[in-house]
């Protein structure tokens, strides 16, 4: 575990306009490194936001907002639970590294946390993309005092791309001889294997609202009537290959045709 890990955050924003038109633009980036030494963990995020407000007339105003964000997560192929479990149960008589530099033996199941926390075992990379848009219109009805109509539409798009590449790795054990020779042992999977997943999600939200507020002498009348419609759908596609001849080519078409799997699903809901 590292004593500290760097983090960064930066953003730039611009706003301005006039009485009838206002705008706000923002670009941002932030991220942090993992807590393991030579860590395969990392998180980066990049985003863009824009808000526009316009007063079209004395009775109509329009606002539009959009947000685009990408989240990039990088993980080792072993889970944090597995890594910390091995770290907690490590034996003081088993070295993390031999004096000659080779990685020490595992506790069991190939778990040597100084190796499984790095990209020596492969990687698990996940990218999430968000696009969120909202358009809103307010209309004050001039011939009906106190009546305002509001309509809004939201369109959201989400993509997720995951690529997980597991590859064999070597740990070294003492052969028990007086010459203190360490011998390699293959751990992990016998051959590299690749999992890829793609998720595509779309969401619509439409709403209409009529709001009436008016004071008559000592009495105030307020009535609100609205309706809303929503639709969501998602498509998922996944594929798996193994028996790669080399761990240098992490592409699906380089995997073997034996024991391959493909899968997919979709769903839709509305209200």
Give the location of each predicted region.
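Flexible loop and strand-edge segments within Gram-negative outer membrane beta-barrel domains
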Residues: 3-28, 32-39, 47-113, 122-130, ...
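Extended, hydrophobic alpha-helical segments in both membrane/secreted and soluble proteins
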Residues: 48-50, 151, 206, 271
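Surface-exposed loop/turn segments flanking beta-strands in extracellular/periplasmic regions
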Residues: 82-113, 167-190, 233-264
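Extended hydrophobic secondary-structure segments that form protein cores and membrane-embedded regions
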Residues: 149-157, 222-229
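N-terminal start-of-domain structural block
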Residues: 154-217
């Amino acid at each position: 575990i590292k004593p500290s890990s760097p983090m960064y955050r930066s953003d730039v924003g611009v706003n301005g306009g006039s009485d009838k038109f206002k705008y706000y633009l923002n670009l941002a980036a932030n991220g942090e490194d993992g807590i393991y030494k030579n860590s395969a963990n990392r998180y980066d995020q990049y985003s863009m936001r824009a808000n526009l407000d316009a007063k079209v007339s004395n009775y109509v105003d329009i606002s539009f907002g959009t947000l685009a964000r990408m989240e990039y997560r990088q993980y080792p192929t072993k889970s944090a639970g597995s890594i910390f479990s091995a770290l907690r149960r490590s034996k003081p008589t088993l070295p993390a590294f031999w004096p000659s530099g080779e990685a020490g033996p595992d506790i069991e199941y190939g778990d040597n946390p100084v190796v499984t926390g790095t990209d020596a075992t492969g990687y698990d990379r996940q990218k999430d993309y968000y696009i969120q848009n909202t358009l809103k219109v307010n209309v004050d009805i001039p011939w009906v005092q106190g009546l305002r109509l509001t309509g809004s539409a939201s369109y959201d798009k989400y993509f997720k791309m995951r690529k997980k590449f597991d590859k064999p790795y070597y740990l070294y054990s003492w052969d028990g001889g007086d010459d203190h020779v360490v011998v390699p042992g293959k751990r992990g999977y016998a051959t590299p294997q690749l999992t890829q997943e793609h998720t595509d999600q779309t969401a619509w939200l439409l709403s209409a609202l009529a709001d009436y507020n008016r004071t008559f002498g000592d009495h105030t009348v307020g009535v609100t009537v609205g309706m809303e419609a929503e639709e969501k759908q998602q498509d998922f596609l996944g594929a798996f290959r193994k028996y790669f001849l080399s761990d240098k080519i992490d592409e699906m078409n380089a995997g073997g045709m034996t024991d391959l799997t493909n899968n997919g699903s979709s769903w839709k809901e509305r209200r």
